[in-house]
Amino acid sequence: MKKKPISDSPGRFAYDGLDRVIHEKARLSIITSLATHPNGLLFNDLKDLCALTDGNLSRHLQILAEAGLIQIWKGFKDNRPQTLCHLTEEGRKRFVEYINVLENIVTDAVSVEKAPAEEPKLSKGWSPA
């Protein structure tokens, strides 16, 4: 459930829920791709969707698997090796939590868009740095 922002509370803009494992661009694209394909994706399909090289995708998949966010399955089809990647239940849960934090960030950003930029009202003695 999304929390309603409380203005100026301590840590208000810390966004602690931004999961560092997911937040990296390549891993975010992998997790998002897998979340939208509940039956999983083959390595080459995932590579194409995320525009990653074989080595780059392999390394990010390893990090996500070690974090328990994805499962990697090895098998054969037509005597050719295949790798299937699938989002775990824990991965799905953490991705949803991550998305909720992003929604809070978007809410904050929209409020900035609506508010006009103003010069601060300062007493004498202040000057721009």
Regions found by a protein language model. Give the residues of each.
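Short, charged, low-hydrophobicity "junction" segments
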Residues: M1-P5, G40-F43
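Amphipathic alpha-helical dimerization/coiled-coil segments
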Residues: K2-S9, F13, T32, K93-A129
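N-terminal helix-turn-helix DNA-binding core of bacterial DNA-binding proteins
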Residues: F13-N56, K77-D78, Q82-H86
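Short, hydrophobic-biased segments on the C-terminal half of alpha helices
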Residues: L61-Q62
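Glycine-centered, phosphate/nucleic-acid-interacting loop/turn motifs that mediate DNA/RNA or nucleotide
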Residues: G68
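Short beta-strand "wing" residues that participate in macromolecule-binding interfaces
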Residues: I72
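Basic, amphipathic "hinge/linker" alpha-helix immediately C-terminal to the N-terminal HTH DNA-binding motif
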Residues: K77-L102
